[in-house]
Amino acid sequence: MKSKTRILFTLTILLFSISLAAQQEKNIPIGFNLQLKNMHLWRGLQVSNEVTLASDLYFTDKNQAFKLGIWGGAGISGKYKEFDYYASYQHKGFQISVWDIYNFSKDATYNNSEVFNYKAHETGHFVDVSVGYTFQGKFPLSLSWSTVIFGRDRGANNKENLYSTYVYASYPILKDKFIDLEVGIAGAFALNPEDGTSANFYASSAGIVNINLTASKKLEFGKYTLPVSVMGMWNPKGNNANIQIALDLLTF
């Protein structure tokens, strides 16, 4: 136990040192983020219920408008594993992104062993397209529309894509105060549901799948900055609730 504690302490000091150096660099075309979470929540879903490390490596232009990257997550026990590709663009309040998401967790009920299999009826991937806008000025409401356009979103009969859609709205209640506080709500439905059901990627029927409240703060340790967030998430359709705590250990 003492050995594990020493290793964890050494790793923490190393990450702090690397991040401090990285935060002093400017205008580099490569970005990286390492995040530690008590669990991984996404769009109303509890993707991982164990301590999770998430990493994001991307290339960007000098204005950081375009991004092309890979995102990965892994649970501490190895049960949860994910590897994604993405491309995104943002300008002022407008954002658009395309994600190829591949969760190959150990207990998955779909194809979790063929990363290069993109056959519509067999693949474990799904491709999600999101478009969003954040209003500028005194009313910074954010709205987004996300639709799964390909992959494991084909319903119980596996005949054709359901085009499951997730519509989200969020608003910052507090900004640049002692803490930042944001509230959000989302609904999900299928654009092409199977006969006799409104089941979609996110729930067994159409409805509200995510109500959340997120508090975030940047902690200062000398020249090192540690962003911390706590998100309470309620899923009315799933009849569950969770709290996610996240630490951005390393960012450059």
Task: List where the protein language model places each region.
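Outer-membrane beta-barrel transmembrane domain signature
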Residues: 63-65, 137-140, 144-229, 233-239, ...
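Short glycine/proline- and aromatic-enriched beta-strand/turn motifs that initiate or cap beta-hairpins
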Residues: 23-75
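Outer-membrane beta-barrel domain signature
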Residues: 41-48, 72-76, 110-111, 115-122, ...
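Surface-exposed loop and membrane-interface regions of Gram-negative outer-membrane beta-barrel proteins
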Residues: 66-90, 95-119
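Residues that define the transmembrane beta-barrel architecture of outer-membrane proteins
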Residues: 26-30, 49-53, 79-83, 90, ...
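Hydrophobic, well-structured mid-protein blocks that either form specific transmembrane helices
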Residues: 106-162
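Cleavable N-terminal export/targeting peptides
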Residues: 1-29
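Transmembrane beta-strands of outer-membrane beta-barrel proteins
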Residues: 31-37, 56-58, 69-73, 88, ...
